[in-house]
Curated annotation (Swiss-Prot):
Similarity remark: Belongs to the heat shock protein 90 family.
Annotated Gene Ontology cellular component terms: cytoplasm
Gene that this polypeptide is encoded by: htpG
Spans annotated as C: 559-636
Protein name: Chaperone protein HtpG
Length: 636
């Protein structure tokens, strides 16, 4: 196939420009990214040769070679791995199909802060594109294992690339960088020198499991001619196989960046070994930042599976539950078959045991952070709390551990979240329920009519603002014998026995006085509500809308419908504040024979205001605003 010039996909072109004009201070990491890609290609070739007996490839000497030419100012990273087809080159390099790309680019454009931009780029992981931080032109030559012809790709990072056939390409991939001039002010080192390359490999890629080789010129002895010697630059020691006291923090950090393609250091390291019936080593990391695709169904899981240091697969879902999908790292199991499939992994007894132990260790680590390193814990929960709470829904085995690390906002202290254990210690005498409220944000919840009685009586309420909160509180149900109870469901009675006795006569009078209005409103609003009653939870608002204890909330209804589920609409209950002038005025207007049409309009306004006050949505906003505008006009 002849040479052709193609344009980068729009988002790839924008990300490429960020690299060409990069503000990232540590440009040395381009080599780490290229070596990581080469290492992945070698792992994939070895795995393919094990699974496909018809694939005729030599895996006896899998390695990475680095070649430098100071005169031509080039640096080449070469591997004899799996290689790529022409279509793969276009797909992998010319296009970015990664979830979150558009969001990343939008945020980067809006950010004027260099440090924030660097963190965002690091969270996304740019891999191959990092080469353009240090190179004016990049040439890639590759041939897929088992194919006869290769592909040559070239670009100067200006929005287009050239792709052509390469009949003489060896198996694997070679990336040649035509380097920019060294510039100390821009943190551009001279990457065509042996010493610089050696230092970068030692710092970032020493643990890579394949040899990284480079031809090194050795001076001759006694004035003789110099010779060239091929040296291995890395130690190739699997970090997870070493004991924790043998590993420096910097080594952990660089290994994390290798497996995660993150550019920030991890928040916490979990290094463990399992012995006995099932032997394994695990090196896991809690990231500092949530990835952009954390809530994407296509988002990548973070744990790689090895068997006796042989790479088996990325994103091993069988090793980590969905609510810990952000955990990165490596698990090396000793007794699995090299040919095990993803499907069989789900049922494998050893994997199930390993998974159970990993989850318990991760949760224990977070609990330890919560107790001893509150700043780290706060960072963790801010980034990943909404995901971790998903585990409360289905992981009954670890539910108690999850509740121990749970952190939620509360009316007790606007600045500091609380946990359930601390809430219980602050409960009033005689209080048997843990009260909570759900909504889009703290402000909406605090200003909701449902909160009025709780605020007046001094009862603490948990403020839950994540969509998953609606689900887990229903599923969990109680904590230490205390029922989790929504302030927006069921009847509310916060009075003491003495207060209840003193107020009983007044309540009976109100029930008698408002009986006719309640009956009329129940009939008038029958299409919207199933009952109208007097409220014990309102102190300043005229009305609110509540549900029964086991009703599906409007937020959950909306969520289920967005997911494509058929959910019958639940009619809710309208509660009235008998001491509010609007409610008492409506009662008097009905007794005085005001026109039915005017009374109905007032009833609709009362119900609509109750919906809006809790952050709900009107079924017919234009009808509501028309009635409201007409009423306001009469007052002028």
């Amino acid at each position: 196939m002849s040479s052709e010039t193609l344009e980068f996909q729009a988002e790839a072109r924008q990300l490429l420009q960020l690299m060409v004009h990069s503000i990232y201070s540590n440009k040395d990491v381009f080599l780490r990214e290229l070596i990581s890609n080469a290492s992945d290609a070698l792992d994939k070739l070895r795995l393919a040769s094990l699974r496909d007996k018809d694939l005729d490839v030599d895996t006896a000497d899998l390695h990475i070679a680095i070649e430098i030419d100071p005169d031509a100012r080039t640096l080449t990273v070469r591997d004899n791995g799996i290689g790529m087809s022409r279509d793969e080159v276009v797909q992998v390099i010319g296009t970015i199909a990664k979830s979150g790309t558009a969001e990343l680019l939008r945020t980067l454009r809006e950010s004027a802060d260099a440090e924030t931009s660097q963190e965002l780029i690091g969270q996304f992981g740019v891999g191959f594109y990092a080469a353009f931080m240090v190179a004016d032109r990049v040439v890639l030559v590759t041939r897929e294992a088992g194919a006869t012809d290769g592909t040559r790709w070239e670009s100067s990072g200006e929005g287009t690339y050239t792709i052509a056939s390469a009949t003489d390409a060896p198996q694997g991939t070679a990336v040649t960088l035509h380097l920019k001039p060294a510039d100390s002010e821009d943190n551009l080192h001279d990457y065509a020198t042996e010493w610089t390359v050696r230092q970068i490999v030692k710092r970032y890629s020493d643990f890579i499991a394949h040899p990284i080789r480079m031809a090194v010129e050795q001076p001759g002895t006694d004035g003789g001619e110099s010779t060239t010697e091929v040296q291995t630059l890395n130690s190739m020691k699997a970090l997870w196989a070493r004991s924790r006291d043998e590993v420096e923090p910097a080594e952990y950090h660089e290994f994390y960046k290798h497996v995660s393609h993150d550019w920030a250091d991890p928040l916490e390291v979990v290094h463990m070994r399992g012995e006995g019936t099932f032997e394994y080593e695990a090196l896991l990391f809690l990231p500092t930042h949530a990835p952009l695709d954390l809530f994407s169904p296509q988002g990548r899981r973070g744990v790689q599976l090895y068997v006796k240091r042989v790479f088996i697969m990325d994103d091993c879902e069988a090793l980590m539950p969905g609510y810990l999908r952000f955990v990165k790292g490596v698990v090396d199991a000793h007794d699995l078959s090299l040919n095990i499939s993803r499907e069989l992994l789900q049922q494998d007894r050893q994997i199930q045991v390993v998974r159970r132990r990993l989850v318990k260790k991760i949760l224990a680590t977070v609990k330890e952070l919560k107790a001893n390193q509150p700043e780290k814990y706060r960072t963790f929960w801010t980034e990943f709390g909404a995901v971790v709470k998903e585990g409360l829904i289905d992981d009954t085995e670890n539910r108690d551990s999850l509740l121990e690390i749970l952190s939620v906002a509360s009316t007790h202290d606007p600045a500091e979240p609380t946990d359930l254990a601390d809430y219980v210690t602050r409960m009033k005498d005689g209080q048997t329920d843990i009260y909570y409220a759900t909504g889009e944000n703290r402000s909406t919840i605090e200003n909701s009519p449902h909160m009025e009685a709780f605020r007046a009586k001094g009862f603490e309420v948990l403020l839950l603002t994540d969509p998953v909160d609606e689900v887990w509180v229903e599923r969990v149900g109680e904590y230490e014998g205390k029922t989790l109870r929504s302030v927006a469901k069921g009847q509310v009675d916060l009075d003491t026995e003495e207060e209840r006795s003193a107020a009983e006569a007044e309540r009976e009078r109100q029930r008698t006085e408002y009986a006719d209005l309640l009956t009329w409103l129940s009939s008038t609003l029958a299409d919207q509500v199933r009952e109208v009653r007097l409220s014990a939870r309102l102190t300043t608002s005229p009305a609110c809308v509540v549900g029964d204890a086991h009703d599906v909330t409007p937020t959950l209804e909306k969520m289920y419908r967005a997911m494509g589920h058929e959910v019958p609409q639940v009619k809710r209950i309208l509660e009235l504040n008998p001491t509010h002038p609007l409610v008492s005025g409506l009662r008097k207007a009905r007794e005085q024979g005001v026109t039915e049409e005017s009374l109905k309009e007032t009833a609709e306004l009362l119900y609509g205001m109750a919906l809006l006050a809790e952050g709900g949505e009107l079924a017919d906003p234009s009808h509501f605003t028309r009635i409201l505008a007409e009423r306001l006009a009469r007052t002028l």
